[in-house]
Swiss-Prot record:
One of its GO terms (cellular component) is endoplasmic reticulum. It is found in: Endoplasmic reticulum membrane. GO terms for biological process: endoplasmic reticulum to Golgi vesicle-mediated transport; protein transport. Its main location: endoplasmic reticulum. Present with 11700 molecules/cell in log phase SD medium. Keywords: Endoplasmic reticulum, Glycoprotein, Membrane, Protein transport, Signal, Transmembrane, Transmembrane helix, Transport. Involved in the export of PMA1, possibly through the monitoring or assisting of PMA1 folding and acquisition of competence to enter vesicles. Glycans are attached at residues 35, 53, 85, 115, 170. It is a single-pass type I membrane protein. It comes from Saccharomyces cerevisiae (strain ATCC 204508 / S288c). The keyword Signal applies. Residues 19-188 are lumenal. This is Protein SOP4.
C-alpha cells in the first residue's frame, strides 16, 4: 500500500514538473478600440522563434493568428529548459500587411524560480539591435521592459502605405508611346496588320510568280479603262 502511494506521488510530481516546463504567451493587438475585421485578421500574424540555449534538438518555431475580433492571440505549450533559475528565450515578430506595428520585435524570457513558479518577462527589442545587450560594453543599452499580465500588448504605429510588390524598372517601347498604344488595342493592331498585308502581298506574289503578278496588273488596268469608258459614254 505504501509503495503504491509513493508511486502515485512520484507520478504526480513528474506530471507537475512536466507541466511546469511548458509556457504560454498571451498577447493582444490594440487597434485603438476598433474590432479586428476578417480582412485584417487574415493579413496579420505573429511569429515566435526560440533563441539561445534550448533543451530540444531544434529550436521551437510557431506562427499564430487572432483568436477573436478583439485582437487576442496566444502561443501555448511552449517548451522550456529544465532546472532552477534556468531561462528560456523567445523572440516574437508581429507582422501585418495593413498596419505598421510596434514593437516590431519582442524578446520574451521564461525563468524557473526556486519556489517552483515560472516568471515571464518581455522586452522591446527593435530591428537592428542584438537580441541581448552585449556584456562587452561598459554601459550597454538596456532593453525596455513590457507589461506581460494579463497579456503582452502590441500597438498600432500607423497604417501601412499601399505596397507595390512588382514594379517594372525599365519600361519597354512596346508598353508605352505609339507602339504600346497600337499593341494594347486589338482593333488598331488588326488594322496595322491588314495594311502591312496589302503592301507586302503584291511584292511577295511578284517575287514568287511574276506571270501571275503581271496578269493581276493587266486585269486591274483593264477594269480601270472600262470604268473610265463607262463614265465618258455618259
Amino acid at each position: 500500500m505504501f509503495s503504491q502511494i509513493v508511486l502515485l506521488l512520484s507520478a504526480f510530481i513528474y506530471v507537475a514538473s512536466a507541466t511546469a516546463r511548458r509556457g504560454t504567451i498571451k498577447g493582444r493587438l490594440d487597434l485603438a478600440a476598433s474590432n479586428i475585421t476578417g480582412f485584417v485578421s487574415t493579413r496579420t500574424s505573429f511569429k515566435l522563434y526560440q533563441i539561445g540555449n534550448f533543451s530540444t534538438e531544434y529550436p521551437y518555431t510557431s506562427t499564430t493568428m487572432f483568436q477573436d475580433d478583439e485582437g487576442n492571440f496566444e502561443f501555448a505549450n511552449l517548451p522550456l529548459n529544465d532546472g532552477v533559475n534556468e531561462t528560456t528565450y523567445y523572440v516574437m515578430y508581429p507582422a501585418s500587411m495593413d498596419f505598421n506595428l510596434k514593437p516590431n520585435r519582442i524578446l520574451i524570457e521564461f525563468k524557473n524560480l526556486e519556489n517552483g513558479t515560472l516568471q515571464l518577462n518581455a522586452f522591446k527589442n527593435f530591428f537592428g539591435r542584438e537580441y541581448f545587450p552585449s556584456k562587452d560594453i561598459t554601459y550597454p543599452e538596456k532593453l525596455q521592459s513590457m507589461k506581460v499580465h494579463p497579456y503582452i500588448t502590441v500597438e498600432l504605429l500607423h497604417k501601412a502605405p499601399i505596397r507595390s510588390y512588382l514594379q517594372a524598372r525599365n519600361v519597354s517601347i512596346f508598353s508605352t508611346g505609339i507602339v504600346g498604344n497600337i499593341l494594347n488595342s486589338r482593333w488598331k493592331l488588326a488594322g496595322v496588320i491588314t495594311l502591312i498585308a496589302l503592301v507586302v502581298f503584291p511584292i511577295i506574289v511578284e517575287k514568287l510568280d511574276p506571270e501571275t503578278a503581271r496578269a493581276i496588273r493587266e486585269e486591274a488596268k483593264r477594269k480601270q479603262r472600262e470604268k473610265y469608258a463607262a463614265v465618258a459614254s455618259k
